Amino acid sequence: VIGVVTVPALNETLEAPPRDRVRALKQHLVRSLRDLRAARRPDKLIQRTTPEPTGFAATVLAAGCATCQGHCCKGGGEHAYIDERTMARVRRDNPDLDARAIIRLYLERLAPRSYQGSCLFHGEAGCTLGRPLRAELCNAYYCNGLRDFLIRAENSDRVQIVAARNGIERRSAVLTRTEKSRGLK
């Protein structure tokens, strides 16, 4: 039996990031760093980090996001959900970097071509930010279809992802749990 995991489907055009959107992102990063500096206890802002998925679950989640192409990233716009909590973690993890270097760290990772109107880090191959630079929301979020899969992951040995929205449908290859990944979620 093949389990079907249904996810949304993004259908947007890729474009070079418009200057005004990049400028808005830079202003947002500056504000987030200022908010961090104004915090009484910046260490208390750091959120617990969501562990990266492993095993068959990681395979299915990666295929789900790739098949969807990042519908959930659309809301990231010019802020990428980054705020003073994200900056607190980034500052803690990179104590040798000053504010300008952190802003440069982000700007250097902009997608050369991002989906129109979506997060500026939402490139053709997914997020151009590594997990340590992403907002915790981005590391922790899964759409309903993927969240439902995670709840029943141990019962699924064969899965196919179906991304559908407004008459568009994309399917992944059938994913099969290997003996090596058996027992891993």
Model-derived features: where do they sit?
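Hydrophobic scaffolds flanking metal-cofactor catalytic centers in soluble metalloenzymes
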Residues: 2-185
